[in-house]
């Protein structure tokens, strides 16, 4: 008894095998996590260091460079960028995809420890790190609002009570709080009153620090009791500081309230946050690199009542924005496409076989194969995401192929007079090797994908494993369950309750007769057909060169990020007004649902906005159209620019640019970089292939440059360090004392009252008390002039860097933009000391584009090797592969027709076509070789008979695969921009391939047979058989 007979004769065992596959698949489906895409995030660690009051250039030289030299030695770092601004340095380390984030964090900590001795001694704390990418869009934004509490109090609640609890949620990588700063006692000094009293700013500082000292005072005890000694040595509120005596003058006390305004405020008054136009504290939550967005947000939502319980009455905690609704909607759309695809595939089978009994067989085998695949997805540690669901949708079109080939062949034997049982045995034996060849060669396409690295490799890997698993399960079902069901369900036509001859059946017969006549003509004019095939190959090359290319389709996630960039000399008050104006304009758009934003911190000329659009079904336009509309309205706002970009699921690089793509200029000479960056930016801004061109080069800030008269200072008894201390006390929002509270530590902040520090004339009011006790005005030993100074200094690697960000205009492609940038750089004639390189997603595109052709050739070579092994022939694998050029032309023409650029998703479609379209040739070649060997027919008669005999199954399998891809090609709704390129590629490729290969494959077969006969007198060994 053969293996096929075993399954046909034991229906219970075969049915239970299928049931077991289904149950295991359902269990896997239930346990599968849900995500927008496969896990493709680079491990990223952010290092932060601070030195209050230090300029951007000082931070870059004394803090960033020592840290970069130490961190650059860590294994697996593929990109290191840093940004230094007033008092802070931030270094972003991006690691290789295969680097474990926890191991990388240990290496980072070791490098920070090694670099500690090289850092300035005045740093208030050691550098710290976080395992999160600051350039990622938050997965959720919480807002804290209240009519009873101040912004400082709300910030305190958020940072003290909420941030730590949220950070403990599994999957959360970083929690940042914006919109204000911690509460503080603020001392705003009156320089005129101090001068009149002959009291220096440092005297005030020392008096405050001495009055607020908390030290352990010990305990007293007798034989039976013990008392802890405590005192009121700490001053905690503004009210307690006001009567503080600074000094005595002529026997009279000088109190703090006599020379300063004391209030309960915040540490940094130059921060503002808003939500929908109202003041709010923003809690931005980013996930860790390996976390699942949906699971993380679900945990956050479940913990929300407990978080609200930590807050006092009158404080509202709300989720202002959440990225998961559009992700869930996108997955629902793919699930609907999958259901439609399965229904269409089964309809194709019904229309061709015209039998409800026959249609029931693929109606069972297709779901079993697809459900069983879910178990494989779970065992491999993957998720249920857009790509894996698209893979299942496409699989619905070709897992039915195996069942169709077996079913159609068995049905043909029944029509020829065999009993269903004998027809099942004969039919499955006859096509078993063919089905095996189709499945194995289809799976072979994905072998090169498993060796790809980077983000494309991660995407392809999961897609390839999913499809390979579906192919393997489909093959098993086709050779076991399908023949068993055929033996039990199929009946001869005269006893079957199937449909009688219909117009469709007559049309099918007419098509077959027409094909027979046209095939004869084609074989008589084989040379012209061969020339046509060569022309198709040339057309492939031209189309691939001509088609616009991009890395990944622009997604509409329903979320936009806005970056406000104002004049580098703008004040905080003016910047806050710009933020309010921009938020008002954006909120007025009919497609916008929610807007949050903040400004302040070390870069007072910038701000950030997070915009949630209405659900796709409730708005009239997609994200890119909304951006274009807002860009027009926002262009009339003077003094600042708002750059908008749609949040994407795939983003690389740690630098937070103003747009989706980056081009970085590098130089070891900062002067060269600063000279050429404006010229390069101007040239790129003039390119029509780019839009929203901006730069992170902030070197036009205004400063007052002081020049000390050192001989005069020596004569007056004044030290440079004393002058620097004076200026820090006056203008640096200096934290001069610490307030220790049960839940947090706060500070006393001292500076000159902002009313006396609005312009450069504030320096005229500064004075210092020399060693002789005389008040000496600053102008007595120093002069100053306005000058330009960098607000930030950026590095990449160990070189000075300036990153130019850009978006693409509507209909633009990344390949056109890349070519235009390359030509512009060549035309500028930049010096060798200035290097230009793409960064982030644009760099990934460059890397992926260089390997695309190699990947396609590797897949073709793998298929050739597998087919050569199966058929023991060097020649006929070429016959089978001759079907590929027509599929490529169809796919590329379809993409161009629908104005879709060639992306990674389209490349996945091309790889699928390599596996799909060759099955037609396999069916023909396999039957032709068998007819030559067993019936001793000539090559022409054998291929002619094979074409007519396999016309119906070829038509059925191609239409099944085509109809399986149609729901993707014509999909709409959330996530359609991901599904459409895949569906368009497959539908276009299958259509053109189906038309051409029915004629080119027989011609190529004849030429290959002539070639084989010429070079070998011996007949090729027969292929492997069961």
Curated annotation (Swiss-Prot):
Keywords, sorted A to Z: Cell inner membrane, Cell membrane, Membrane, Transmembrane, Transmembrane helix, Transport
Residue ranges crossing the lipid bilayer per the database entry: 16-36, 333-353, 360-380, 387-407, 435-455, 459-479, 528-548, 853-873, 897-917, 953-973, 984-1004
Membrane topology: Multi-pass membrane protein
Any one GO MF annotation of this record: xenobiotic transmembrane transporter activity
Compartments in which it is found: Cell inner membrane
Taxonomy, superkingdom: Bacteria
SUPFAM superfamilies linked to this entry: Multidrug efflux transporter AcrB pore domain, PN1, PN2, PC1 and PC2 subdomains, Multidrug efflux transporter AcrB TolC docking domain, DN and DC subdomains, Multidrug efflux transporter AcrB transmembrane domain
Signal sequence, start to end: none
Chief location bin: membrane
InterPro entries: AcrB_DN_DC_subdom, Acrflvin-R, Multidrug-R_MdtC
GO cellular component entries: plasma membrane
Subunit annotation: Part of a tripartite efflux system composed of MdtA, MdtB and MdtC. MdtC forms a heteromultimer with MdtB.
Family according to the record: Belongs to the resistance-nodulation-cell division (RND) (TC 2.A.6) family. MdtC subfamily.
Stated name of the protein: Multidrug resistance protein MdtC
Organism in which the protein naturally occurs: Edwardsiella ictaluri (strain 93-146)
